[in-house]
Regions:
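A ligand-binding cleft/hinge motif common to bilobed small-molecule-binding domains
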Residues: 122-126, 249-268, 316
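Extracellular/periplasmic bilobal clamshell ligand-binding domains
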Residues: 329-366
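Extracytoplasmic ligand-binding site segments that recognize negatively charged/polar headgroups
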Residues: 61-77, 88-106, 110-247
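Extracytoplasmic "Venus flytrap"
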Residues: 35-47, 55-74, 199, 282
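A bilobed periplasmic-binding-protein/Venus flytrap-type ligand-binding module shared by bacterial periplasmic
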Residues: 162-169, 205-210, 280-293, 303, ...
Length: 366
């Protein structure tokens, strides 16, 4: 199935499901606070009430797209040390898998999931009516682009997409430094990118169209098309590995922290910025019928706090919190190597993603 087809199949299911979602709210114990009451709590004794409720609940189920050994387990260990009366269970999958799983569970009136994360998946289930707005005192520490205006999601970490290059094949001072420089005949047939919807060519196209404007952006992309960029369905990580192996000197759009990790391991690779850099956001959200709302709110507060964000930092993820730098500081916006980034928010990717995929398929794959 194509990247567009996969995306649409989930959306069609979500739309159909919206018709009945109002009737599929989970059961609550008589006299118990509603999920909304707990999620939106702002009283002075909020922390005390969350802890009291969480002790009765005892667990959380977290659906995640994050790498388990790199960051999920460290977050679990740090949180359970802070709150030893709560156990985190997690299920790891890609975005489509998590969305399908959650939709199927709600259709079956089985309410297992408490939290769901991803760059787009929370918005997908939000549009199906399956998320609960929530309040966290830590929202105040984040800029507008890193939190949902209605309170449906917060941010745990960031991804910055930049070119990566083989340091044995090309020197830093020879690299194309701007989008216009990519059109230099020298780079024809010398670049490679992934067809991945959320991190490859389509989102690169989205950056160009948004930063240059539709008319100028499409004119530019027509010229870029003539550069014969090699395309692969491989992940961005695999594209970078091919660059390290010498298949192409430049990987056009990869996660900069992947290049850093490989470089520190001794690989002949580095990254550099063409501004504005494409940025995507890992978000986390609360399920509408979470069976463990008190415990879930404690975990949401934890991952949004500076303390929780430092777990992401030590796991070589790029923390979303403005006051928590990356372990390698220059990987983040404002860390010294780039100063302009275009944030592709989950809503923006959801609303414009098909348009960018269509353009890529019609102009670069034919």
């Amino acid at each position: 199935m194509t990247i567009k087809g996969r995306r649409l199949s989930v959306w069609v299911a979500a739309v159909a499901f919206t018709i009945t979602v109002a009737a599929l709210t989970g059961p609550r114990q008589p006299g118990a606070a509603s999920v909304e009451d707990v999620a939106m709590m702002k009283s002075a004794d909020r922390q005390k009430m969350l802890i009291e409720g969480a002790k009765k609940e005892g667990k959380i189920t977290w659906y995640t797209t994050l790498i388990v050994d790199q960051v999920v387990r460290p977050v679990k260990e740090a949180f359970e040390k802070e709150y030893p009366f709560i156990q985190i269970d997690f299920y790891r999958g890609n975005a489509e898998n998590l969305v399908r799983r959650m939709l199927a569970e709600y259709q079956a009136k089985r309410y297992d999931v408490d939290l769901i994360d991803g760059t787009v998946s929370p918005v997908m289930v939000q549009r199906a009516g399956l998320l609960q707005r929530f309040y966290s005192p830590f929202f105040a520490e984040y800029p507008a682009e890193l939190k949902d205006s209605q309170g449906f999601w917060g941010s745990t970490n960031l991804y910055f997409l930049t070119p990566g290059y083989n340091t044995r094949m090309v020197k830093l001072n020879e690299l194309p430094k701007t989008y216009q420089d990519l059109l230099n005949p020298r780079w024809k047939g010398q670049m490679m990118w992934s067809t991945s919807r959320g991190s490859g060519a389509p989102i690169f196209i989205g950056n160009v169209l948004m930063s240059m404007g539709q008319e100028a952006g499409k004119a530019y992309l027509q010229k870029l098309k003539g550069q014969n960029i090699a395309k692969s369905t491989a992940s961005n990580r695999q594209i970078l590995d091919l660059t390290i192996a010498g298949e192409f000197p430049i990987a056009l759009h990869i996660f900069n922290h992947h290049a850093y990790i490989s470089k520190t391991a001794g690989a002949p690779v580095d990254w550099y910025a063409i501004e504005p850099v494409t940025a995507t956001i890992q978000t986390i959200a609360l399920a509408k019928s979470t069976p463990h709302p008190h415990a879930s709110m404690l975990l949401l507060d934890f991952v949004l706090s500076e303390k929780g964000q430092k777990v992401f930092q030590q796991s070589n993820y790029l923390p979303a919190h403005p006051k928590v730098p990356a372990k390698q500081a220059d990987l983040k916006l404002g860390g010294g190597r780039f100063s302009k980034a275009l944030y592709m928010t989950p809503d923006l990717q959801f609303d414009k993603g098909n348009e960018w995929v269509d353009y890529f398929q019609n102009q670069f794959l034919k």
